[in-house]
A protein has these predicted regions:
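Short linear motifs at protein or domain termini
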Residues: 1-107, 113, 117, 238-242, ...
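Solvent-exposed loop and edge beta-strand segments that line ligand/cofactor-binding
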Residues: 190, 194
């Protein structure tokens, strides 16, 4: 876990700042469990009473939450990013779906450009590692795993951009996607030709990043998001056509 001994001062305040910083930088993630009190106090080099004071402060600020019998967790602050009524409205209207994709195209293109310029070698190694997992999983045809790695790949790029506002904003957007608000990614990954195209697009993004070619990285992301939008429109049209065909079949067999 990413905790360091703190400098002597008011220890509880130093603990609060360190944990806040880890949450701000996206290192500690929503719903992640903190180590047990004894272990965490030892790692941070503070007394358990000082740690308790810090945890209490962070709970009162809404950044940490206690689960009875389970421990202390990072609060799911992203869950409150969109009101339930708004997420339901998003889900019911195609306009929101394609605005979401347009937003991602712009933001992730910028993130890729920043990652190529500003990301550390370690940042890019993380991106490479996730892509390697994507490539290895390609032969397994597991749409759930594909969708999970897809999200990890894009988030690794956003993390490598080192903009904490963008990081938390995009995490909130990805949470909506994981919840199936906009569209079902698993359906897209079940199509063989689409899966192959998506893998090659991710390869192009990764290659540009590893070469630190900011412009190509941005363009590769935009090409990828354009493809996702076209695939989704085709998927929706195919679904509408199937509904019409079923109505015709029902009419022919019962008429």
């Amino acid at each position: 876990m990413p905790f360091r001994p703190v400098q002597p001062e008011k220890l509880s305040s130093a603990v609060v700042r360190q944990i806040e910083q880890l949450i701000l930088r996206g290192i500690l993630r929503p719903a992640e469990r903190l180590p047990a009190e004894r272990e965490l106090a030892e790692r941070m080099g503070v007394s358990r009473p000082s740690l308790r004071d810090a945890i209490k402060t962070l709970q009162e600020s809404g950044l940490l939450t206690a689960r009875p019998g389970a421990g202390i967790y990072v609060a799911d602050v992203l869950g409150s990013g969109f009101a339930p009524a708004l997420t339901q409205l998003f889900a019911r209207h195609d306009e929101a779906i394609f605005d979401y994709l347009s937003f991602r195209r712009d933001m992730e293109g910028l993130a890729a450009e920043r990652a190529a310029r500003l990301g550390s070698d370690t940042d890019l190694a993380v991106v490479q590692t996730v892509f390697d997992k994507m490539a290895a999983a390609h032969s397994k045809s597991n749409s759930d795993e594909d969708a999970k790695l897809d999200a990890q790949f894009h988030m690794a790029i956003i993390e490598a951009s080192h903009n904490v506002v963008m990081l938390h904003m995009m995490r909130s957007m990805y949470q909506l996607l994981r919840d199936g608000v906009f569209y079902n990614r698993q359906v897209m990954f079940k199509q063989r030709t689409t899966r192959q195209a998506l893998l090659e697009q991710h390869r192009a993004i990764n290659t540009a990043l590893q070469r630190r070619d900011a412009h190509k990285a941005r363009d590769a992301v935009r090409t990828h998001m354009d493809y996702v939008e076209r695939a989704l429109r085709d998927q929706q049209e195919a679904q509408r056509n199937e509904e019409i065909a079923l109505q015709r079949l029902d009419h022919e067999t019962t008429g």
